[in-house]
Amino acid sequence: MINLVDLGRQFQHVKDDILHEIEQVIDSGNYILGTKVEELEKKIAKKLNVSEAVSVANGTDALVLTLEALGIGKGDEVITTPFTFFASAESISRVGATPVFADVNPHTFNLDPSDVEKRITSATKAIIPVHLFGQPADMDEINSLAKKYDLLVIEDACQAFGSIYKGKPVGSLGDAACFSFFPTKNLGTLGDGGIITTSNGKLAENLRKLRAHGTTKKYYHDRIGYNSRLDELHAAILLVNLNKIEEWNSKRRDWADRYKKYLSGASHIQLPKEENDRKHIYHLFCIRSKQREKLMEALRAAEIQTGVYYPCCLHLQEVYKNLNYQKGDFPVAESLSKELFAIPMHPYLTESEQDFIISILLQNGGN
């Protein structure tokens, strides 16, 4: 079986270093908000060219805590994409605000700024662009809208650690950015984790309170908070992987280039597009085809794993029926949900594996 993501293979390359780090944590006797967490936060802030990084328990909490810390809640609207993982909208609902969806660009799969502007109302407080699959969103246009209408911008960068937009790292392009360290992410741990990056010191202070029960000092609280802390063990693992992220992302880009080289002539497949002023880090390599089911079945028969991202747009989810969206409201997003699928992509793919994947895709073209 050729796996969509091969975490076992990937972690074998850092296993000894991780075990050494875990042993250090065990010996320290300090397992929550210790020196490893502090070191990770400082290194990520420096890498992403921001002044603050606040680690939390997972990427979803990163979004929820950021929205709450920015004062977004009941009666407010936040614009985001309907073509993404559920947490992007769920976090908005969790703080009592209303998610408002805008359609996406058919080539990058990210928010279409022109459609975003049509959705802005007097209740709109923020925009959450998602850097989907590792492709940076149109941040200049989104930030321009935010400035024009006095809105906040929260980057959902959960799939995009290491992506670059016009020379600037994703995670430094809005009022705050949220990352996930779920195991399958480009920078992941052996469990859950997340981090929020910002250059707003007051926001970072509020986030640190929120992640630890609203604590100002031990046993004293000035607000209702959460229990959302990154464990020392996960921070230690992430420090090891942080040293590998440039190499891993570079390998992903190499595999992506190779897919594009050999599949570019296939009329039944539309390949992901990388904008010239951006660095896509291919968290997933998703191709588009009106023959999706046929191609996926051929790959399954050849023991090649695939995945559909995402089969149901968020505006059509049962839980959001009350928002009164209908099929056809976001035609680009809805067509992607019917045609897009992911093929294997990870740093330790091999040429022979990739050649086999490419051959199956090419052999099963046509009607």
Question: What residue spans do the PLM features occupy?
Answer:
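N-terminal "arm"/small-domain region of PLP-dependent enzymes with the aminotransferase-like
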Residues: 1-30, 35
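PLP-dependent aminotransferase class I/II
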Residues: 8, 20, 37-43, 47-53, ...
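Phosphate-binding glycine-rich loop
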Residues: 28-77, 91-95, 101-103, 168
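Structural detector of well-ordered beta-strand residues that form the stable sheet scaffold
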Residues: 54, 79, 100, 153-154, ...
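PLP-dependent aminotransferase-like
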Residues: 68-157, 164
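Hydrophobic/aromatic ligand-binding patch that stacks against planar heteroaromatic rings
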Residues: 91-92, 145, 169, 186, ...
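Conserved active-site segment immediately N-terminal to the catalytic lysine
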Residues: 155-190, 218-222
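Short beta-strand-to-turn element immediately C-terminal to the catalytic PLP-Schiff-base lysine
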Residues: 179-180, 194-199, 239
